[in-house]
Regions:
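Alpha-helix initiation and N-capping motif
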Residues: 4, 13, 28-31, 39-46, ...
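An internal, acidic/charged active-site-proximal segment
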Residues: 117-195
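A short alpha->loop->secondary-structure connector
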Residues: 24
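Active-site-proximal, Lys/Arg-enriched surface segment
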Residues: 30-103
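DNA-recognition alpha helix
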Residues: 3-19
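Structural signal for hydrophobic packing residues in well-ordered secondary-structure cores
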Residues: 11-15, 35, 39, 136-143, ...
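Short, conserved catalytic/metal-binding motifs centered on acidic residues
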Residues: 4-7, 27, 31, 65-76, ...
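Gly-rich Lys/Arg/Thr-decorated short loops/hinges at beta-loop-alpha junctions or inter-strand turns
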Residues: 108-120
């Protein structure tokens, strides 16, 4: 909820206010209080609203023909006993409870696409395939799977994720840890220039 402060820029964006039908955009403190009071079913409704708004604005100012998804997982340190928080990998605050959400952003417009809140004791690839399935389900019908690229760090590199993206015919760039078999395969690859 600390990142709500980034919405302050919308207070001065008359076009956005007109699109959503607000006389003025609420203050960050008001938004934070509102979001803290939401129950899970309200959060699901808010996600659906976000997806509908994205669909309505997707082709503006011109239709897109491709998408690039950036996957990320981040450790959110918590203080207190928040529901679902667990002690897990936490390089800055060892032993603290945290969340480890999965996030997907569309790179061209730096647009939030989908997110999933997970306990802190999960690794990056945990639940990545179902997460990607939801991300791809939100792609408008006019964009071919071959025009979708997925990028992720080494936490997402694994057999299940690679096989899923191959089956979906989506392109991908996943960082792989430098193990000897991977190095040997990389040396044997031919360079192919892409358009």
């Amino acid at each position: 909820l600390d990142r709500i402060n980034a919405t302050q820029v919308l207070q001065y964006n008359g076009a956005f206010q007109q699109i959503v039908g607000l006389p003025q955009f609420p203050d960050a403190t008001t938004l934070r209080r509102f979001l803290r009071r939401l129950r899970p079913r309200h959060i699901r409704q808010l996600v659906r609203l976000h997806d509908q708004l994205r669909q309505a604005l997707f082709a503006r100012p011109r239709p897109r023909s491709s998408l690039v998804f950036d996957l990320d997982s981040v450790v959110l340190v918590l203080y207190g006993h928040a529901e679902g928080a667990r002690v897990g990998y936490n390089p800055k605050k060892r032993g603290r409870r945290s969340y480890h959400p999965l996030l997907c952003f569309e790179a061209h417009r730096q647009e939030f696409w989908h997110g999933s809140l997970r306990p802190g004791n999960t690794v990056a690839a945990t639940g990545a395939v179902p997460f990607l399935r939801v991300c791809l389900a939100k792609v408008p019908p006019g964009i071919a799977r071959s025009r979708i690229r997925v990028r992720g760090d080494s936490g997402f590199f694994g057999k299940r994720v690679v096989e899923f993206l191959d089956e979906e015919r989506a392109g991908y760039t996943l960082v792989a840890k430098e193990h000897k078999p991977i190095k040997a395969l990389a040396r044997g690859c031919r360079f192919q220039k892409l358009r």
